[in-house]
């Protein structure tokens, strides 16, 4: 085999990346993955050519979204036919398919031209660590996360809280919330829970949750 | 601008029917008659052999006299043809007058010898670490008939050579070029002939890779032999990279090391190919004939004064 | 001046990397000129420069306000008028960058002619293919559309020689001081 | 003779119909030379033979006749490596045929060209390689495209990737994590302690 053939094989080889999506923001990591799938991270990138690399995204179930994005953000599916207009909130979508959130973020970061389909086909998403052996063998590099993984409150050891420097002293007369809410819990009898009336027509797509999900506007979600 | 729609043919838009039929008939006759027989360039009117030879002497900046060039350009088959024509014309073999010119076999032998020596010297000087078999393989490739035939047809000897058939065969072309080198050697001296060889035969290597001309059957075996000579340990190959192992576009990058020192690396679709190419790459780096090697200074070989003393 | 050795880049004019919003480790601290480590770098690069036999050099050249990366034995094509005829040897003045496999010297903006010599020879002067420009002006009675045909004169130049004539400018003084 | 700018060329038989304007479809080539011309110490002019067919009487070859009368000797003396044949052909259009070393031929009709234009065409034949009018796919030609090594996905990657088993723990964090608020407070606290102790 000639030297230049070996060189061409090396230069145009398709590199397989692994991405651990635990605690990562799908939007920021979606931008990185889209760039790698299109091959724009290579100096030999050319729009006509498919110089993209493959990416295996794991732990997409543990993706972290900002603030109350799980509830307020939604997947809008608009079709011309009736009854196919859906506004699925992300938490519902996550239940249906844990890998879909990251997939949609990468899809939105890709320019919507004809080869997007083929580039997206090079993205393999898995909800947990379980990856088929023949795929994990291909991996040769790992994409680094795009945010610092925070420490959960229940992971804090009492030692940390003690050593953390005291910024200021609480005033003596301050009363922390010592109300014991469990006492005032009332179990709602089933007959009181509002039934979902089946509504047809324009409201059909929107009215499928017993709590109000303002998908377009940002409002407080009233949970009773 | 309204354009009339007209019938059209390969001869252009159809104006008159009789013209179209006439041309179609001519075309059919041509196909039946077959291509024109090949003719000697000297058969055409605008041909003057002395002027051509005079121009040829000036073309390459070599000061040759016309007679030696005429000898270099005449082929043995041309002389045979003359003798045959004379015998047909009834002249007995004895009283045929000797010709003013001779064929170019001896000059060709001389030229080939000069070219061979010079090429060996130049390659050995510029690639000192390259083994002798490699240099011989390269000189054999450079002096092979096909290469020399291309070179001489590129120098315009195709029409200048006098031989029995219109387009000279590769052997005639090679003889002509070597005879030309021999005649330079006679007229102006060996150094001038060697500069000619450097400018036209050695430059044939410009686009080519030395390591590919010399096909090494078993690169790893050769590598072990070379390392033993240098007193280093046997080569080991390690996998440096492997992507897409189970996919179709799999790439392995294998590196060759001896006693933890890096020798060479290369990529391949499978591990065996990558290893073999890595061995070739290691050889290339050991012999210092890889891309970062400077190009052969074709015109400065003598200015560097390195070839004269050898 | 910016000298890069293989992978490690020595940024002589140290500038804080504005784009990165994180503290960038400085490769080279400020008073760098007379440091011992940089002296070795200068001497190493100068030795590489003298070793003429084994280093294929490449250069970036500006010709007819186009920049070309050239090595020896390669052909560049200059499009428009170019005075020299076939067989003329040219020396290129505007050399922006010179390098080999181990070092790269970048001029700001061009390198000193006493340091670098890049020569070429004119091989061929031909005409380009026939190029056509179609022009259309609506509502014009006499001539509404026009085809403008031309051929550009092309000149092919082969690069014959790239040489470094001396040590890298600016490095020998500091070593001698 | 220097070849001055000739942007507007009145090509003898340049009709729109014969012109093919689709750039992608026109025949194209890469730059190449015969026999690595120019690499060695000498340059070989590719034009071998030049045949000028001219009519002594017709008006169309007036320029060709002027050129032959005035410039032919100077041209032949300047370029001894080119064989020039002059063919007087009665009542025919003037032509220029250039034959090149590699055997290519170029034919240029000279009807109604004046002496200066004939000279220009002859010099364009002289400086050519033999097959002009190609669309160039690339403006340059190199045999050694890269000296420092062509980029591969592995050039700028750390070498330890092959030894790791994926998913790898320490490759998941950010490469240059920003200093979070808690870390800043802890650093300030340590500094305060240091200042107090020192």
Segments (PLM) and residue ranges:
Chain B
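Double-stranded RNA-binding/processing signature
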Residues: 1-310
């Amino acid at each position: 085999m000639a030297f230049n053939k070996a060189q061409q094989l090396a230069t145009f080889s398709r590199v397989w990346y692994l991405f651990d999506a635990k605690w990562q923001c799908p939007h920021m990591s979606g931008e990185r993955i889209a760039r790698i799938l299109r091959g724009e991270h290579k100096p030999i990138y050319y729009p006509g050519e498919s110089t993209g690399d493959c990416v295996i995204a794991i732990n997409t179930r543990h993706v972290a979204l900002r603030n109350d994005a799980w509830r307020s953000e939604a997947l809008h599916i608009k079709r011309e036919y009736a009854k196919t207009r859906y506004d699925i909130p992300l938490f519902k979508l996550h239940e249906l398919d844990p890998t879909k959130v990251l997939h949609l973020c990468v899809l939105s970061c890709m320019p919507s031209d004809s080869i997007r389909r083929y580039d997206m086909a090079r993205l393999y998403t898995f909800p947990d660590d379980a990856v088929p052996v023949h795929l994990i063998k291909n991996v040769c590099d790992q994409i680094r996360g795009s945010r610092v993984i925070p420490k959960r409150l229940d992971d804090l050891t009492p030692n940390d809280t003690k050593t953390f420097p005291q910024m200021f002293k609480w005033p003596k007369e301050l009363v922390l919330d010592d109300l014991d809410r469990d006492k005032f819990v009332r179990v709602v009898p089933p007959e009181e829970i509002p039934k979902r009336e089946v509504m047809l027509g324009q409201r059909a797509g929107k009215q499928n949750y017993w709590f109000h999900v303002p998908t377009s506007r940002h409002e407080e979600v009233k949970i009773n | 601008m309204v354009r009339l729609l007209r019938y059209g043919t390969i001869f252009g838009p159809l104006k008159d029917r009789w013209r179209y039929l006439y041309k179609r008939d001519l075309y059919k006759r041509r196909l039946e008659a077959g291509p024109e027989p090949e003719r000697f360039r000297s058969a055409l009117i605008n041909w003057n052999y002395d002027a051509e030879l005079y121009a040829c002497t000036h073309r390459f900046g070599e000061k040759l006299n016309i007679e030696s060039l005429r000898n270099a350009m005449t082929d043995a088959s041309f002389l045979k043809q003359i003798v045959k024509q004379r015998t047909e014309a009834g002249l007995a073999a004895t009283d045929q007058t000797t010709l003013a010119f001779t064929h170019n076999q001896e000059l060709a032998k001389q030229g080939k010898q000069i070219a061979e020596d010079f090429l060996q010297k130049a390659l050995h000087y510029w690639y000192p670490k390259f083994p002798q078999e490699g240099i011989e393989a390269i000189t054999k490739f450079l002096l092979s008939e096909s290469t020399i035939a291309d070179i001489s047809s590129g120098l315009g000897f195709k029409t200048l050579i006098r031989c029995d058939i219109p387009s000279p065969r590769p052997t005639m072309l090679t003889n002509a070029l070597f005879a030309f080198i021999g005649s330079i050697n006679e007229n102006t001296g060996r150094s001038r002939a060697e500069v000619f060889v450097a400018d036209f035969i050695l430059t044939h290597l410009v686009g080519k890779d030395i390591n590919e001309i010399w096909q090494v059957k078993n690169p790893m075996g050769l590598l072990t032999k070379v390392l033993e000579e240098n007193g280093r340990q046997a080569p080991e190959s390690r996998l440096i990279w492997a992507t897409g192992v189970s996919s179709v576009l799999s790439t392995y990058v294998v590196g060759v090391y001896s006693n933890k020192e890096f020798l060479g690396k290369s990529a391949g679709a499978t591990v065996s190919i990558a290893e073999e190419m890595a061995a070739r790459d290691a050889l290339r780096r050991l012999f210092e004939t890889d891309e970062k090697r400077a190009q052969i200074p074709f015109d400065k070989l003598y200015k560097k004064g390195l070839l004269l003393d050898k | 001046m910016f000298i890069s050795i293989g992978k490690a880049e020595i940024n002589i004019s140290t500038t804080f990397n504005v784009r990165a919003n994180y503290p960038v480790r400085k490769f080279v601290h400020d008073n760098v000129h007379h440091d011992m480590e940089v002296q070795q770098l200068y001497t190493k690069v100068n030795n590489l420069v003298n070793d003429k036999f084994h280093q294929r050099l490449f250069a970036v050249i500006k010709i007819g306000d186009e920049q070309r990366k050239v090595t020896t034995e390669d052909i560049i094509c200059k499009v428009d008028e170019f005075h020299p005829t076939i067989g003329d040897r040219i020396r290129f003045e505007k050399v922006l960058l010179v390098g080999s496999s181990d070092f790269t010297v970048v001029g700001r903006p061009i390198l000193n002619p006493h340091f670098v010599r890049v020569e070429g020879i004119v091989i061929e002067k031909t005409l380009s293919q026939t190029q056509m420009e179609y022009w259309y002006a609506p509502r014009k009675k006499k001539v509404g559309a026009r085809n403008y045909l031309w051929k550009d004169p092309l000149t092919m130049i082969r690069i014959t020689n790239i040489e470094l004539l001396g040590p890298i400018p600016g490095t020998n003084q500091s070593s001698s001081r | 003779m220097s070849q001055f700018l000739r942007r507007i060329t009145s090509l003898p038989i340049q009709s729109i119909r014969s012109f093919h304007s689709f750039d992608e479809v026109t025949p194209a080539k890469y730059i190449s030379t015969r026999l690595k011309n120019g690499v060695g110490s000498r340059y070989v002019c590719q034009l071998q033979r030049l045949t000028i067919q001219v009519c002594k009487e017709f008006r169309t070859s007036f320029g060709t006749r002027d050129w032959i009368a005035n410039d032919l000797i100077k041209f032949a003396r300047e370029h001894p490596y080119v064989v020039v044949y002059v063919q007087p052909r009665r009542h025919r259009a003037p032509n220029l045929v250039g034959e090149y070393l590699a055997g290519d031929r170029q034919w240029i009709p000279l009807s109604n060209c004046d002496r200066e234009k004939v000279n220009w065409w002859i010099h364009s034949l002289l400086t050519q390689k033999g097959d002009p009018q190609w669309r160039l796919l690339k403006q340059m030609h190199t045999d050694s495209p890269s000296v420092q090594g062509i980029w591969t996905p592995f050039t700028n990657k750390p070498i330890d990737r092959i030894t790791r088993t994926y998913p790898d723990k320490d490759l998941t964090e950010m490469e240059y994590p920003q200093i979070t608020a808690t870390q800043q407070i802890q650093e300030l606290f340590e500094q305060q302690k240091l200042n107090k102790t020192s």
